[in-house]
C-alpha cells in the first residue's frame, strides 16, 4: 500500500499541467503555413524524450526537446521550381517532304500493270501517279534499287493529306472503321496503312508529330526477281465521314538506314473507293480534257466566247477566180434574162468575196450599176386583195 501511495504522489508526465508547456513547443502560425510546419512525427515525443522525462524531470526534458533539431533539406523548393510538363497538341507543325529523292541507291517504286475493268481491286495510273484500290484489299508496291542498301535498312510508309490546308492534320481511320473487329493483332485500330503477310512490321506513332507509320525491314530481291514487293492494305475509304472525308492523300515511302538517316524517298496519290477501275477511267478522261489547249478570248472583250467547235474548225480556203470567158447561145428571151440574172448574182458573190472581211456589204454604186444593167421585162406586180371582213 505504501508503494501504491508513493506512485500516486508522482505527477504524470502528460497531465493537464504540462499541456501548456507542450503547446509552447509548436511553431507559430502552424495552421496557416503547412509548408513550414514540421511533420507530425517531430511533434510526438520519442522514446528517448520519455526516458529523459522520468530520469531528469519534466523541466529539463522540456528544455532538451525544445532545442532546435537539425533541419533536413526539404525538396519543396526544388519541386516548386520544376517546370510543368508541356501540353501535347493534336496537330503537327512539321510536314514530311513528298519530293522524289532516289539517293545513291537509285530508290524508286513500281506497280503491276492492270486495266480498268470493274472487277479489278487495285489499279495504278501512270499518267496521274495515283493508286486506286478497294478497302482492305492487297496493294502490291515494288521497291527498285540500283545497288543493295546496307544491312539494317528499313522501309517506312506514311500517309499525309495532299492539299496544303489539310497537311498538318494526321491521317487516321474514321470512328466507324476504328470500332470494326478487323485487327490482325499487330496494327492499332486507328492506323490507316497496314502491311500484309509480314510479322516483322512495326506500327509507330511519332511522339512529336503524332503521325502514324508502318516500318518493315528491307529485304533484298529473291533469286530470279529484280525488285522487292511489299503488300499494303488501306483500311478506310476516302469518302468516310470523320476520316479522310473525300480529301486526297499521299503515301510516302522512304528508305531509311539503321540510324534513321534517309536513303531514298518516293510518293504516290491514293484513292480508296468501291470501283477502282471506273474511277481511274473517269479521272484519266478528265485529265486529258484539262490538258487540251483552249482558245483564250481576246483582251478587253465583253462578248460571249464562241464554243470550241466553231472556233477550232478550220475555214475553207478561197479558190482563185477563173479569168476565162465563154459564149453561150440561148434560145428565147425569157431564158436569156433568167441566165443573165443568175450570172449577175454570181458576179456579185465573187465581188463580195474579194473584199476585206470587215466589209460585208458591197458598195452602193456597184449595186446601182448592176441594177441598171438588168432589163427584165417580166416584172409582176402583186396587189393585196381586200376581203369583205378586212378593215
Swiss-Prot record:
Q: Quote any Pfam family the record assigns.
A: P53
UniProt KW keywords = Acetylation, Activator, Apoptosis, Biological rhythms, Cell cycle, Cytoplasm, DNA-binding, Endoplasmic reticulum, Isopeptide bond, Metal-binding, Methylation, Mitochondrion, Necrosis, Nucleus, Phosphoprotein, Repressor, Transcription, Transcription regulation, Tumor suppressor, Ubl conjugation, Zinc
Consult the record and explain the modifications the protein receives after translation.
Answer: Phosphorylation on Ser residues mediates transcriptional activation. Phosphorylation at Ser-9 by HIPK4 increases repression activity on BIRC5 promoter. Phosphorylated on Thr-18 by VRK1, which may prevent the interaction with MDM2. Phosphorylated on Ser-20 by CHEK2 in response to DNA damage, which prevents ubiquitination by MDM2. Phosphorylated on Ser-20 by PLK3 in response to reactive oxygen species (ROS), promoting p53/TP53-mediated apoptosis. Phosphorylated on Ser-33 by CDK7 in a CAK complex in response to DNA damage. Phosphorylated by HIPK1. Monomethylated at Lys-370 by SETD7, leading to stabilization and increased transcriptional activation. Monomethylated at Lys-368 by SMYD2, leading to decreased DNA-binding activity and subsequent transcriptional regulation activity. Lys-370 monomethylation prevents interaction with SMYD2 and subsequent monomethylation at Lys-368. Dimethylated at Lys-371 by EHMT1 and EHMT2. Monomethylated at Lys-380 by KMT5A, promoting interaction with L3MBTL1 and leading to repress transcriptional activity.
Q: Name one GO biological process term.
A: nucleotide-excision repair
Q: Where is this region: Interaction with HIPK2?
A: 317-358
Q: Is the keyword Endoplasmic reticulum in the record?
A: yes
Q: Which residues carry this modification: Phosphothreonine?
A: 18, 282
Which parts of the sequence carry N6,N6-dimethyllysine?
A: 368, 371, 380
- State how the cofactor is bound: Binds 1 zinc ion per subunit.
Which residues carry the site feature described as Interaction with DNA?
118
Positions of the UniProt region annotated as Oligomerization: 323-354
- Position of the Glycyl lysine isopeptide (Lys-Gly) (interchain with G-Cter in ubiquitin) cross-link: 289, 349, 355
Q: Which cofactor does it need?
A: Zn(2+)
Q: Which residues carry the record's DNA-binding region feature?
A: 100-290
Instruction: Using the UniProt annotation, give all residue ranges assigned to the region (Basic (repression of DNA-binding)).
Output: 366-385
Q: What does this protein do?
A: Multifunctional transcription factor that induces cell cycle arrest, DNA repair or apoptosis upon binding to its target DNA sequence. Acts as a tumor suppressor in many tumor types; induces growth arrest or apoptosis depending on the physiological circumstances and cell type. Negatively regulates cell division by controlling expression of a set of genes required for this process. One of the activated genes is an inhibitor of cyclin-dependent kinases. Apoptosis induction seems to be mediated either by stimulation of BAX and FAS antigen expression, or by repression of Bcl-2 expression.
Report the domain remarks: The N-terminal and C-terminal disordered regions undergo liquid-liquid phase separation (LLPS) following homotetramerization and activation. Post-translational modifications, such as phosphorylation or lactylation affect the ability to undergo LLPS.
Question: What PANTHER family does this protein's entry cite?
Answer: CELLULAR TUMOR ANTIGEN P53
Q: What is this protein called?
A: Cellular tumor antigen p53
- What organism is recorded for this protein? Marmota monax (Woodchuck)
- Gene assigned in the entry: TP53
